Amino acid sequence: MGDSNLTDGSEGPFLKYALFCRGTAETEGGELTLNGIVDLLDLPEPEKSSASENPVLATVDYNLAFCIGGADPGEHYLFVTLKTPGIPLETPPAQKVEWEEGILFQRWIKTFRIPVQKPGIHAAAILFDGIPLGEATFLVRFSDDAKPLEST
């Protein structure tokens, strides 16, 4: 009970995994390595005067690595959007993807430049043909021990 079985005949697409990381590498054999998995970002407390000048505290470049399985062969639409505290971010258009017969899983790595405006949960929501499959998240918090990030 409670265990998921990838061969249980469940219908429809599902999110196998999704996470933020700093880098990726793939071998010739197709093995994927995720480097610097990000689940927490510590930032120094901003100065009170600078908060009103620029709402962006830091900008981070992270990879979103995710894998979808269980889709029927044919044309589909993949939609990934960032949800962050603060001013809403521009939403990218959906991406058309072709799912071929016999494919069990497809994985994607998308690079995002994320403007951090406030502490809290930063998420990437993943939708496939308009169906929410899940999300990857990381938490931003203020810490006295944090070193300032260089905005890029």
Show which residues each predicted segment covers.
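Contiguous segments within soluble domain cores/interaction surfaces
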Residues: 2-128, 132-152
